[in-house]
């Protein structure tokens, strides 16, 4: 029995997608949940797994096609004698011989004595024209070689559906939201020591080390419980600020297709270990094109890690309609003055950008100090 592989809705509001890869051929065997296509939407590039097992008898689309919800992309099951997609013609080899020849142009240049009136200057033949014939009338015949024009080729980059969506979202955010930005330098010395002491335990119990980023996200979540306005969004239709009950922390992930921001759902209920596991899981799914739109929707605040690229400070752009984005920079060892002399401390640059329409710089300052307190005093950051 033949089964139709249809393009189904993989997320809220999705109506179509662009086929970017076809991972199987007609005649191949495929298993249930094995990827058959890669499709790009305006929010994500994701694999489409097969809901059926069997032999692929037809593939009805090609790379570059835009498919709509319900469209039959392939047939799995009984083999058909004639595939639904015509095979691509094989290119023929042609050998062309091109002869290049330089064209010589012979022209006459009439030179008058009046052209050289100063200091008795007379025209002299250069080596390039010394064999030309000079007439008594001062006519000079010069043989010149025409040089081919050099052409500078320009390269173009096609804008993907996802890149276009990113551009539109960033432009919208930058145009609508006036940001206030503050940077804090947080003493993460105790956190560094604590992380080093528990990573062996975490590796043996959870098969993973706990990243600094997981601790930072947990500290931000803790601080949001005291400053919920930074976990809010503005509703222009009702002209009111909506305080979100859940803290869904968006994690900026750098992928080949561009920046993807999946979010950790209900982060306020998770431990440091659970947050660390969620970060790894979402990043892997994003980079292997297995992310779902449900992972991207309903974020309430975003966090980005400048430190992963060695950067300390930057100006992050808020993801509209969120209220805030927090950026963590590269950890640095600094010599600082202490009560009994000097000491080496581990310093975390922490940057907060917030919507200045609804919060002031002083609010951002208090929020930043609370995050710093959570990190410096290791409040609720233990690994159990």
Curated annotation (Swiss-Prot):
Main EC class the enzyme belongs to: transferase
Catalytic reactions of this protein: N(6)-[(R)-dihydrolipoyl]-L-lysyl-[protein] + acetyl-CoA = N(6)-[(R)-S(8)-acetyldihydrolipoyl]-L-lysyl-[protein] + CoA
Function as written in the Swiss-Prot or TrEMBL entry: The pyruvate dehydrogenase complex catalyzes the overall conversion of pyruvate to acetyl-CoA and CO(2). It contains multiple copies of three enzymatic components: pyruvate dehydrogenase (E1), dihydrolipoamide acetyltransferase (E2) and lipoamide dehydrogenase (E3).
Cofactor(s) needed: (R)-lipoate
Keyword Transferase: yes
Record note on cofactor: Binds 1 lipoyl cofactor covalently.
Pfam families assigned: 2-oxoacid_dh (PF00198), Biotin_lipoyl (PF00364)
Protein name per Swiss-Prot or TrEMBL: Dihydrolipoyllysine-residue acetyltransferase component of pyruvate dehydrogenase complex
Subunit structure: Forms a 24-polypeptide structural core with octahedral symmetry.
GO cellular component labels: cytoplasm
Gene name per UniProt: pdhC
Organism: Mycoplasma genitalium (strain ATCC 33530 / DSM 19775 / NCTC 10195 / G37)
């Amino acid at each position: 029995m033949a089964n139709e592989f249809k393009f189904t809705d993989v997320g809220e509001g999705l109506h179509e997608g662009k086929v970017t890869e076809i991972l199987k051929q007609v005649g191949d065997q495929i298993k249930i949940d094995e990827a058959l296509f890669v499709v790009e939407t305006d929010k994500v590039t994701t694999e489409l797994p097969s809901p059926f097992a069997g032999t692929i008898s037809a593939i009805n689309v090609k790379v570059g096609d835009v498919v709509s919800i319900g469209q039959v992309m392939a047939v799995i099951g009984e083999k058909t004698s004639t595939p639904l997609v015509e095979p691509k013609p094989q290119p023929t080899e042609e050998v062309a011989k091109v002869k290049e020849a330089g064209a010589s142009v012979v022209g006459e240049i009439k030179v008058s004595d009046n052209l050289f009136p100063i200091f008795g200057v007379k025209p002299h033949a250069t080596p390039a024209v010394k064999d030309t014939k000079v007439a008594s009338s001062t006519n000079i015949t010069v043989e010149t070689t025409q040089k081919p024009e050099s052409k500078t080729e320009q390269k173009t980059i096609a804008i993907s559906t996802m890149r276009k969506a990113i551009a539109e979202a960033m432009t919208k955010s930058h145009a609508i939201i006036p940001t206030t930005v503050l940077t804090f330098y947080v003493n993460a010395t105790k956190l560094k020591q604590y992380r080093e002491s528990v990573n062996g335990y975490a590796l043996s119990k959870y098969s993973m080390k706990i990243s600094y980023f997981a601790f930072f996200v947990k500290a931000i979540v803790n601080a949001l419980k005291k400053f919920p306005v930074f976990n809010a969004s503005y509703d222009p239709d009702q002209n009111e600020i909506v305080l979100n009950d859940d803290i869904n922390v968006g994690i900026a992930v750098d992928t080949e297709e561009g920046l993807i921001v999946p979010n950790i759902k209900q982060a306020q209920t998770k431990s440091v270990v659970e947050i660390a596991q969620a970060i790894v899981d979402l990043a892997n799914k994003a980079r292997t094109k297995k992310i779902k739109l449900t992972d991207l929707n309903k974020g309430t605040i975003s966090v980005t890690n400048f430190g992963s690229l060695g950067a300390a400070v930057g100006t992050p752009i808020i993801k509209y309609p969120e209220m805030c984005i927090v950026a963590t920079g590269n950890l640095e060892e600094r010599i600082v003055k202490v009560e009994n002399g000097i000491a080496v401390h581990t310093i975390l640059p922490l940057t907060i950008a917030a919507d200045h329409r609804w919060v002031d710089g002083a609010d951002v300052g208090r929020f930043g100090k609370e995050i710093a307190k959570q990190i410096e005093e290791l409040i609720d950051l233990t690994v159990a």
